[in-house]
Each structure stands twice: as C-alpha cells, then as structure tokens.
Amino acid sequence: MAGFDENVAVMGEWVPRSPSPGTLFSSAIGEEKSSKRVLERELSLNHGQVIGLEEDTSSNHNKDSSQSNVFRGGLSERIAARAGFNAPRLNTENIRTNTDFSIDSNLRSPCLTISSPGLSPATLLESPVFLSNPLAQPSPTTGKFPFLPGVNGNALSSEKAKDEFFDDIGASFSFHPVSRSSSSFFQGTTEMMSVDYGNYNNRSSSHQSAEEVKPGSENIESSNLYGIETDNQNGQNKTSDVTTNTSLETVDHQEEEEEQRRGDSMAGGAPAEDGYNWRKYGQKLVKGSEYPRSYYKCTNPNCQVKKKVERSREGHITEIIYKGAHNHLKPPPNRRSGMQVDGTEQVEQQQQQRDSAATWVSCNNTQQQGGSNENNVEEGSTRFEYGNQSGSIQAQTGGQYESGDPVVVVDASSTFSNDEDEDDRGTHGSVSLGYDGGGGGGGGEGDESESKRRKLEAFAAEMSGSTRAIREPRVVVQTTSDVDILDDGYRWRKYGQKVVKGNPNPRSYYKCTAPGCTVRKHVERASHDLKSVITTYEGKHNHDVPAARNSSHGGGGDSGNGNSGGSAAVSHHYHNGHHSEPPRGRFDRQVTTNNQSPFSRPFSFQPHLGPPSGFSFGLGQTGLVNLSMPGLAYGQGKMPGLPHPYMTQPVGMSEAMMQRGMEPKVEPVSDSGQSVYNQIMSRLPQI
C-alpha cells in the first residue's frame, strides 16, 4: 500500500463510496451535534466488535472526539476532499506499529485482512444500521435503531443512559449475516467463508444458506471472515476450529473409505452386474497395467458363454468382451452371486469336470504352444508327447490346452513329477495358471488356487482310473555306462527331452509302451560325472515283464492286437536265395508261422551247408543286421539259444526281432541295472 503513512492504520484509509452515514443520520435526526456524538459512539462500538479492539467504549469516544480534527497527509485527505466530506478516523495512538504479531499469538492485530478481490474496504462502512434494507433482520446491528426524527437529543445526553444503552447493545450483540445475494458485502465474502469448507462443499455440492447458520457459530464465521480474534473470542474460536476441523476430517475420512470400498469392489470384486452368475477360471497379466485380465464363464451347466474383463491402471473396468450367447434365462435375484470365486457349488464342480473331460478329448491330434514359448507339446492320437528341446517342458502334465488367452495346465493323467527341476510349476492334480500373481496375488488368489487344487485332485483320480494311485512310487537307479539307454526289461517310448539348469547333458523322457501302463522314466547323465547315468522311474507297472527284449511282436501297439495268434496266415519262405514278396516299408516285418511254434522268422538257411555258424543277413530286411540261428534245422519248432553278438550270452528267439516303428539301436544289456530295478519293483505291493 504505497503512499500510506506508516503510522496510519488501514481502517484510517478506508473511504466509503456512498455518502457519509453521518450525513444521512443527521438529516434523519435533525440535530447535527447529537447525531455526531451518537455516530461516533456507534462507529467506535462497531470497530470494537468487528475489528477486535479491546478499548473501552467511553475512552474510545473521548479520544476520538478529542482527536477528530487531527488529520494526517495521505491518500485519505485527497479522497475526502474530492468526495466533500470528512471520513471518521480510527484512533491509532495505542496501536503498536513495530510489534511483530506473528511471534506472539496472544497479541491482537488491529489490521483487517482482506483476501477476496471483490471486497472493498469502503463497503464495510456501509452498515445496514443507517440504511433502509428490507432484507435485514430487525436487530441492533442489522436493523434500524429505534430512533425517530423527533427524538430529543437531550435524552441521550445523560452518561448513565448512554452507558446502559450501549451496554445492552454489547450484551445482546450477535452477528446475523443476511442473504449472500442481498449486498455486495456478503457477495464479496462468499469466497472467504467457503475457504475452510471448500473440500466439503465440493463433494456435497450444497451451500449453507444464511438462515441455516446457528447463532453459536456466527461469531466463529465472522471472526474467521475478518481474520481477527479478540480476547473473549480467542478460546472459543480455537475450540470451534478444532471441532470443525475434526468433524470435517471425519466426514472426509468416511467419504474416502466409501470411495475406496467402491474402488476395491470394482478392482477385485465382481465385474459389472449383468444378471448372470459367473465363475472365474483364469487371469493373465497385461502389459501396462498392474491389474490382470480376468476370464469368467457362466455357471450354468449347459451354457458355454465366456467373458473377458479388461481393467485400467486404476483398477476400473474398461472393457467386457462376451463370447457366445446364453441359452437359458437369467437366474432369480436371490441366487445371483455376481462371480463364484471359490466354486463351492456342486453345479460348478460338475461343470468344471465336464469341461475338463471335453478338453481331454478335443486336445487329441492338436498342437498347442504356451504363452512363454517354453513348452511345445505334440499330442498323438490317444496320448500326449512332449517334444521341446530348448525350453523347459512340464513333464508332469498330461496335456496343455488353451481356453481363450489364459494358459491352463491340467495335471489329470500324469503321475510324473520332477522335483529336481525348478521350472516345473505343475503339481499332482492341480491347476497352474499362466499368471503367477506375484507371489500368490494376495490372500484371495491363494485360497482360490487351493480350492481348485483340491477339486482337481479328485478329478485327477477319476480321469486316471481306479487302478492308479495319485502319488506313485519313485525309484532312482544310478549306473555307470557309456550309453544313455539301459535295458531294464521293459519297452519304452521316448516322448521328449529338455535341457536342465546346471547340467550340459539333456534329460530324456520315456513312457512304457504297454497299454494301460502309465509308468514313466527320465534318463540323464550326472553333471559331475559324464559316465554316471541316473534313471528315475515314476510309478509301478501294472503288467508283467515282457517275455523278450527288443522284440517287435509285443512292442508298441502290437502287444494288444493279437498278432501272436497268427494274424498273418501267408508266409514267405526263402530257399536258395529265391523269394517273392510284395513291396513294403523299410522297417516292416514279415512273420512266418507254423504248427509248432507261435514265433518264427524267415531266415536264410542252406541245407547242404550243414549247421551254419556265424552270422548271415535276412533277405527280407534291407539294410538291417539280423542274427542267424546255428544248429537250427528248417521247420524245427524249438530253437536253441544263440550267442549274443555283444555279450556272448544266450538269448531267446524273439531277441532277433525288432519292434515295429522303432529305429535300430544298439542297446547293451546291463544285468546289474535290470536286476536292481526288478528287485525294487518286486518289493512294491501289487496294484
């Protein structure tokens, strides 16, 4: 406020924009002298009540009247001269101008703080006491004084009467703000009054009218309005401010909790209600959002409708994609659950079993690839085969299918679990979702996974058959050999291999070829000793050891189709190097039967050569090495043993045959490995 004298208070510089209240008051009463004294007393009273000065009314009156002719140079003189009247001045003699009010909070500030741009200091002098305001209430400060034009000024000359008059006014004083649209004064202070309650007003979008303000809170509002505190109002204002702030904080806290509950229900609860019951069967992480994409399925047993729920970064639902159409009516409201998280109802369990069984059937002759490109599962006509050489395959899972986008691995027919591999996430009879959930995804996700795991344990037993136990015995055999494949008396089919962490040698997976047998094994070399072969067997065979090893009559799928009973009635004999045969594949076999032996084979015999010794090649096998039978006459039913080409020990006739569909492999016989494995398996209880 440049240009103001430093000893002049702010109130001294206020200039009313309208004619002086003293002029109006003198014209109403008719006696200038008495009206001036009343006006000075009224201004002194108003200043003491509004501005917060504690000076006595009588002392203020005496000092103001004695110093009414003292003017200081400044902006007020120029404005007063221009307006043509003398503005009432404020006594600043007892005001400390050099006191720092910010240091001592008990000191009273005589200045008026105005923060609203629409409020002018001159409007404060436009008191409704001296103006005709129909909207003002009839009170000593907001209405008109009971002064009539004919009132004698001597009636107010008595000091006792005047003291009693103003004492009554001070005792019954209360600030009643009029309607905010009635005057410019309250229009300009609307923003100031709503500062402390801005947060509450913004949420509730409601404004408190002047009639709803209680008298007990009017002093608080007026003191906060002017930014000044008096001694008698200091404690009351502080207490009221604390109470008001506490109540507002309570309201804010309640509303924040309400909004948080709404947000949590939208983020982790049921999606938008559409009238149907849904069961969550999977979720998947989405790039750019910490909330996963959720997948739901209708809980009706005959309904195949699914939906996908996308969420924003804040957890709000942004998109719901439906797949299919409902073939049933909406369930009653009392049976709607929004979303069945744990799936405790029997209907959901039956539906899940039907879906899983249908998935088993539909997965045949298909090839699926997981989201991480680590598992490449090749499925045969009636069984699953794992064939990924570079990634980590889940050897304990019986199949992998994809329902929509989430990757769900169902362990229903497998009993092979690999504890050495940290990458294998599948467990016996459990559901492993592609989304790990960051350590469980919270308490709800852990309970949900546990519930699904318990349900699928029973389902795995049903799918695998009553003759299989959920937890199969495990046998680990470690031998020393130069070859990876050890002969243990059973026939195995390799269905995959993988690279194991910390071991440069791959791990190979095999499955017993006997129908109905689910025994599996994996073979790997030790990382510290390349000659040490570790073979781990999972499960127990439900059949006897095959009669012969490395034979084709019982291997693969031939063991159960009755070829041993003489399925081929026509035999081709080879005599003196002459033969006649239809074209066939490289590894096809020609079986010759006679009346005495169920197993025989076309071999090249020269009757005039006598008992042959050594080896010869079968005419019917191109590029394959076959064994001759020394001392065997043509047509002889029982044949003696012949020396093994490698171990020089007697073997049976069926040893000379190869399995159908298998490549020729050199498999050394390990009596120690076979005997150890057979001894261990013989100790296990029969199934």
UniProtKB/Swiss-Prot annotation:
Keyword Amino-acid biosynthesis: no
Keywords associated with the record: Developmental protein, DNA-binding, Metal-binding, Nucleus, Repeat, Transcription, Transcription regulation, Zinc
List of residues binding Zn(2+): C298, C303, H326, H328, C512, C517, H541, H543
Annotated Polar residues bias: 199-208, 219-249, 354-379, 590-599
Gene Ontology terms for molecular function: DNA-binding transcription factor activity; metal ion binding; transcription cis-regulatory region binding
Bias (Gly residues): 435-444, 553-565
Any Pfam family: WRKY
Tissue: Low expression in senescent leaves. Expressed in both the unfertilized egg cell and the pollen tube.
GO biological process: establishment of cell polarity; longitudinal axis specification; pollen development; regulation of DNA-templated transcription
GO CC terms: nucleus
InterPro entries referenced in this protein's UniProt entry, alphabetically: WRKY_dom, WRKY_dom_sf, WRKY_plant
Compartmental location: Nucleus
Residue ranges flagged as DNA-binding region: 267-331, 481-546
UniProt superkingdom: Eukaryota
Main location: nucleus
SUPFAM superfamilies: WRKY DNA-binding domain
Residue segments, region Disordered: 197-276, 324-384, 416-453, 537-599
Disruption of the gene: reported phenotype: Strong defects in embryo development.
Compositional bias ranges of the Basic and acidic residues kind: 578-589
Function statement: Transcription factor. Regulates WOX8 and WOX9 expression and basal cell division patterns during early embryogenesis. Interacts specifically with the W box (5'-(T)TGAC[CT]-3'), a frequently occurring elicitor-responsive cis-acting element. Required to repolarize the zygote from a transient symmetric state.
Family listed: Belongs to the WRKY group I family.
Stated name of the protein: Probable WRKY transcription factor 2
